[in-house]
Curated annotation (Swiss-Prot):
PROSITE patterns: RIBOSOMAL_S10. Belongs to the universal ribosomal protein uS10 family. The lineage of its organism: Bacteria, Pseudomonadati, Pseudomonadota, Gammaproteobacteria, Vibrionales. This is Small ribosomal subunit protein uS10. GO terms for cellular component: ribonucleoprotein complex; ribosome. GO terms for biological process: translation. Pfam families: Ribosomal_S10. It comes from Vibrio cholerae serotype O1 (strain ATCC 39541 / Classical Ogawa 395 / O395). Part of the 30S ribosomal subunit. Keywords: Ribonucleoprotein, Ribosomal protein. Involved in the binding of tRNA to the ribosomes. One of its GO terms (molecular function) is structural constituent of ribosome. The gene is rpsJ.
Length: 103
């Protein structure tokens, strides 16, 4: 697996979950002898929703809700076979979306 790179993108609504998952991935990769770049925090996406509270009138009465999507990027440079096996066996939290690309 020489001259290859593994790029891992993580997404989650909870920043504590995503930070714990990135720490676990980085620690696993370093333990198996790979060089790690990151975690790189990417911009947080904020979706805002405005909802009318009153069922009939009073347009001034509104609630605002927000969903934040936190993202991290990890590059594993020169991964070994042990690194790939360890990453495949890794069990991450349920609220974290993981996208892996080889390049």
């Amino acid at each position: 697996m020489q001259n290859q790179r593994i790029r891992i993108r993580l997404k989650a609504f909870d920043y504590k979950l995503i930070d714990a998952s990135t720490a676990e991935i980085v620690e696993t990769a370093k333990r198996t002898g790979a060089q790690v770049r990151g975690p790189i925090p990417l911009p947080t996406r904020k979706e805002r929703f405005t909802v009318l509270i009153s069922p009939h009138v009073n347009k001034d009465a509104r609630d605002q809700y927000e969903i934040r999507t936190h993202k991290r990027l990890i590059d594993i440079v020169e991964p070994t076979d042990k690194t790939v096996d360890a990453l495949m066996r890794l069990d991450l939290a349920a609220g974290v979306d993981v996208q892996i690309s080889l390049g």
